[in-house]
């Protein structure tokens, strides 16, 4: 047992979670099979620490309150608030690193500023981060932080019934999406809605 604990303490992971992972988790048709949903289970089980800054928090809040998703806006805010309880939240210096969408740079900048922690950008759109060696898909990130149990982890029925307030907040969002019919929205629709939120902020 002691050796297991020592191994866990050595495997400390940090990640900047792209907004599309939040939305995809909340809109999962089947949360027991949803990799984005399992990412947040990873936070609640302290398998990794999320990192944000005020720009990322602002985008999280704006996107999670979009009427397109048709869920209770207070549920979206509660979910963001719960993520922040686990997160490192501090300002970082902006960079001029070239990305296909300049608005994705906020995620790059935070991960880059925390490279001393080997921080990753966890995204549902890896093609949006070309030439970024620390950008990683949600599936590959789960394999990294929990390699032995990653398959069980995603399919574990306890994901639905977690007592953590983070997972309770996400479950409330997901159940609202299932009820109102917005669950299962395509990746293209999710990306379009995130872009719309960014355009309105400018």
Protein language model regions, located:
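Acidic, PIN/NYN-like endoribonuclease modules and their adjacent C-terminal/linker elements
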Residues: 1, 116-120, 126-172
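Short linear interaction segments
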Residues: 1-2, 167-202
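Short, well-structured N-terminal submotif of metal-dependent ribonuclease cores
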Residues: 1-50
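Alpha-helix capping/helix-boundary segments
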Residues: 21-22, 56, 107, 127-128
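PIN-domain endoribonuclease scaffold, especially VapC-family toxins
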Residues: 41-95, 171-176, 180
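Short beta->alpha linker loops
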Residues: 55-56, 102, 124, 189
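Acidic, metal-coordinating catalytic cores used for nucleic-acid/nucleotide bond scission
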Residues: 96-103, 126-128
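Acidic, metal-associated active-site segment
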Residues: 101-120
